[in-house]
């Protein structure tokens, strides 16, 4: 479907602004609207005149710098930008090859003017290619500098965590303050590089191509389209004419892309004195960096009944204006953002490291300490003595601090000062001095006093991370995962754990839950509270206590200094000297030995092994809940149940985060940790038989299964032989699966069950006597087998003889019951439907049945889908009307018929939903037949 457009001139702009009554709801246009359309048609000649597109640059203003860098977003934009620049370069190269071929075939004497024009065009393309290549090199340089600051920030964060976990002293507090300032400088540099990168993103030229809506667009309708990209806005109004053409007051606008903002589009229908929002969508700008023009068709409504057509052209080289990025005073001048882009060089290392390396060179001869040993070089020792070294070093450090700036007013001054700073400092990877002397001092002297606290004690360990070990392309920044630094030994409650056989840390489940929460609906307060709880839990995680082997002072210092060795990657060997001092070690020399530790640096702990197990189990439950919440076509009822369970899991995590570690490791019963557990006497007695002192809050599923069979053996085996194993497994599946809300893939023997899961099941089922509950569960399991395997006559007697509303019911019961409505004689099917309708009078039974059958609508088995539709029809499950309607377009006739009958049985609401789906299906078929519309869905 082609859309005819007319764009008004400046004199006609007020015509569209006159708002009449919407024809979509009040018929076609009135006399006033017809007069308006005629006046627009008379001025259509002027409307076709090309007008200079207005740019949105005037909306950019200088603002405050947001110290919140987003490395993953920058990486995403950088990859898209590089891909687009390469495509643009390939197209220009292809054009250059074509022009070179024509230039070679053309004789210089023939058509001299044509030859000169071709030669001029050839030189123009060559110049443009050089600009693009230089542009790509500057983008690479910017991102390389950004990665350096990224790694420096991680290193500073890890060192800050190391000092915060060490013994508190005056020196450590001073080091923390200095590290905080260094970390702040890294954050500022990252944000400034992000702002500079925005100057290399080019511009987007957006052209309005009109609305596509078929039945939704009527003559006389007026719409307002608002596009927003950061602080840039484009608001334009349009009108649907009687000849199906569209008139808009503006044709195109230029947007400047940003790193952190996406393109937001909102369409509003103007109705006289009021307006109605048709829909709003968000488009990722990373998809727009393409060399060729794109025809973008965006679904404004959820069902795609109204679409917005845009033509988008990306210009990678924008030289008409200069942008102003938000920056603090003294970093960038107002007009120097684009002017200083191509003279920018990576910033020097923060002054904290400059002063530290200078102090290594200017230290006097090694002095003896109280014990007669040499004074080891350390960060803490340097920070504690930095105020006592005299004005000379203080003035030199002040000069370095002044030189350590990201940019200055003059770009050339910036380059000079930065290069001078680099050559003076040198960024030595190891301390300059005699290696033999250092080894002799380390071998003969006693343990140094100036090292990081905890090295003199064998029960504590320090692990300093090398930046090269971190994966910069990961999904998240591993501020904690890659740097376990100093944690006291944790008492182990199990023999296997005492031997060093520990499980994985809880960092992985925590991050998985946080990733799912960040992609979830932000309007859900339950999920936001859960996110805050998990974030607080992550902050409390500590590196697992390790037993390090004895390490030498020189080995540790070399490992610390090697963390910043990547800064010397591009320096020549003669540039590594400093003030005429001795040279640094050669590159081909072997690296210093890393301190030997026995634990993987990625293992984080909550302080006790049992707490780690509990947190892992409940975080996995949260992960399963969030994954189910993110599934499409989810009913409101199921969503409410999932959110309610998420609230309970948040409460469990809150209780776990407040537990006393010593009390947990020494407790002999659950009551000592959770006094409220005494209210469940029957369940508590069973649980205590499954646990041991020091591990009373969790037990393996196999242990709980054995205890259940041992406790209720006399009750089940005599009356229901062969059912004990099945009954106990069904009970455990309900405990692990949150009462049927989550369907477990099968009970694994190595699976862990927590007291909180067991207590939640007892509370959900209102169980006061566990023995009676198990007897009732045994009857239900027996009923399942009889309904599935018995003949029609026996199954019919069972249906009439049981009080079905008193069942739990189990998922297996509901499935067997639903299938009875399809298979077997008509009399049995009618009886199954009648009994299901009567059992629905019980509120608890109906809720569980609705929950199960609504989930069964998404089953891969078509027969289960058909049975679920029939069951929901008997239950009057109008809450699941939208999910049932979606099956009306199934490929199988039986499923379509069952879904149609169930939908129409819901009365007026079901009829409207069915008509809406049928109309949508017809529109989609008509839309697929149109071959001249290109659609890009975001």
Swiss-Prot record:
Alphabetical UniProt keywords: Phosphoprotein
Keyword Nucleotide-binding on entry: no
Region (Disordered): 402-430, 579-603
Keyword Endoplasmic reticulum among UniProt keywords: no
Positions where Phosphothreonine occurs in the chain: 345
A Pfam family this chain is assigned to: PL48
Sequence similarity: Belongs to the RIPOR family.
Record's protein name: RIPOR family member 3
Organism: Mus musculus
Gene from which the chain derives: Ripor3
